[in-house]
Amino acid sequence: GLTTRQKMKKYRAFYIMFIPLFLCLILFSYLPMFGILYAFTDYTPFKPAQFVGLQNFQKLFSQAGFWKAFFNTLQISITKLVIDTLGSIVLALLLDELHFKWFKKISQTIIYIPHFMSWVVVASIFTMFLSPKNGLINGVITALGGDSIYFLANEKWWRPIFYMIAVWKDIGWGTIIYIAALSGVDMEQHEAAVLDGATRFQRVIYLTLPAISGTIVTVFILNLAKVLNLFDPVWVLQNSMVINTSDVLETYVYLIGISGSKYGLSTAAGLFKSVISILLVAIGNKLSKKLTGEEVL
C-alpha cells in the first residue's frame, strides 16, 4: 500500500482544491465561535470588554420582549416546519402519480424555482400582489364588493400570509428529495397489494410512506436544526404594525445588538437560541430512534 506521503503526492491536486474551502470553513464557521465570549461581557466597540458573568442572561430573561420573541419564534418556526414537511410529502406523492414524464419534469422545475430566489425578491413580489392600493388580490376583493385589506400590516393576517409565502418558497426542496426517495420504492410490493385488493390510499399508507420513512426523518431532523433561523423571511416582511406578532429571536437580537448597541446582550440572546436549536435536534433524534429505530445523528 501507499504511504501517507505518497497518497498526498498522488492526490495533491485534490488537496490544493480543498485548501480554499478549508480556509473559508475556519474563517466563517469556527473563528466566529469565539464571539460567544461576548455573551459574558459588557462589550462596547473601541473599549475593553468587562466580564459580567451571567448578568446579560439575567437581564435578557427579565425582559418581556425577549420572551414574546421567543414564543413567537417557536410558534412560527414549528408551524412552518410541520406545514412544509407535510406539504412536501403530499406534493411528492401527487407528482409521483403523474404518468407524463415531460409534464412531471416541468412541474418539478416550476415548484423548485422559488427555492433559488432571495427573500428580498420574494418579499417584493408578494408585497406587490398584496398591496392594498393596486395589488392583484385586493383588486379581486374590491371587484367583488369587499374592502381592501392591508395583509402585511394586519396582525390577524400576517402569520397566515407568512406561512403561505414561506411554504411556496421552500416546499420545492423537500418535494424533490421525496420524489427521489419514491423512485426507490419496490413496485413489486405495490403490484402484489393491487392483486390483494388494496386501494391506492392503503398502498400509500402501508407501503409507500414506510418505505421512505428514513428519508422523511432525515430531512425533518436537518430542517429542525435550522428551524429557528427566521431572520431573512421575517425581516423582509415585518413592519411596526405587526411587531407583536412577527418579532422573533433573530430580529430581536438584531434590534438590540445593532440598533441598541448592546452587543453582550444580543450575543447572549443568540447563544440562547443556539442552545435551544441543539436541544430540538437532540429531542428530534431521540424521537426518531424511538419511532423508527434509527438515529440520524
Q: Positions of the model-derived regions?
A:
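A structural signal for multi-pass alpha-helical bundles of membrane permease subunits
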Residues: K7-L297
